[in-house]
Amino acid sequence: NLIQLSNMIKCAIPGSRPLFQYTDYGCY
C-alpha cells in the first residue's frame, strides 16, 4: 500500500539512520 509506505517514510525522515533500516521500524 503506497499510502502506508509513504507514512512510514515520513516517519523515518526525522531520524538520522538510512531509510532501509526502517523496514521494521515503521509508524504504528
UniProtKB/Swiss-Prot annotation:
One of its GO terms (cellular component) is extracellular region. This is Phospholipase A2 pseudexin C chain. SUPFAM superfamilies: Phospholipase A2, PLA2. Belongs to the phospholipase A2 family. Group I subfamily. It is found in: Secreted. The keyword Secreted applies. Is not toxic. The lineage of its organism: Eukaryota, Metazoa, Chordata, Craniata, Vertebrata. InterPro entries: PLipase_A2_dom_sf (IPR036444). Keywords: Calcium, Disulfide bond, Hydrolase, Lipid degradation, Lipid metabolism, Metal-binding, Secreted. Expressed by the venom gland. GO terms for molecular function: metal ion binding; phospholipase A2 activity. GO terms for biological process: arachidonate secretion; lipid catabolic process; phospholipid metabolic process. It comes from Pseudechis porphyriacus (Red-bellied black snake). Its main location: secreted. Ca(2+) binds at Y28.
